[in-house]
Amino acid sequence: MHAREIIERLGDGSLDIGFSGFDLLKESEINTQNKINVIKKLNFGKSNLVVAIPDPWIDVQTIADLEEIAFEFRDKKKKRLRVATKYPNLTRDFLFSKGVTQFKLIDSLGATEAYPFTGSAELITDITSTGETLRANNLRILKDGEILKSQACILSLIHI
């Protein structure tokens, strides 16, 4: 069973216990999160959900810089920055909480790191453990671009 499906099944009550990532739990709908208990974080499968931008964007180091670029992009190109992600809820919440509002989310089903190269998005949010794939695709993590720390967890349905 896929890790996302475990979260869904716990949320709909058709599963009592399962293993999945903390990131997938936090990405799920709040109604689903309220039905699931983290029994134990397993201290493996550690990764971070991060904001990554193309290396050539040398003037962008922080989220505040990204906010500035987003407004410039909107004013000059008359469109919003496109952010490719498999984590739309966490990405939207994080960017809004940091004051970045001029963006459009692009759903990614895989190989998110390729989106800027193909011109499908200007930046991405993605899960990474070492950053190697990001670097191989000429992307770098913003200094304050960590959205969430994740790891494998034992999860259970909360029985009321």
Predicted stretch roles:
Residues 65-69, 88, 102-112:
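Active-site glycine-rich loop that binds ribose-phosphate moieties when present
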Residues 34-92:
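A conserved helix-loop-strand patch within extracytoplasmic ligand-binding domains
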Residues 1-8, 104-116:
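Short helix-initiation/N-cap motifs at beta->coil->alpha
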Residues 28-40, 133-148:
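Ligand-binding "clamshell"
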Residues 158-160:
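Conserved small/polar residues in nucleotide/adenosyl-binding loops
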Residues 12-19, 23-42:
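Glycine/small-residue-rich loop that forms an oxyanion/phosphate-binding "nest" at active or ligand-binding sites
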Residues 14-16, 78-82, 103:
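Short active-site oxyanion
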Residues 16-21, 122-128:
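Paired acidic/hydrophobic, glycine-rich loop segments that form the ligand-binding mouth/hinge
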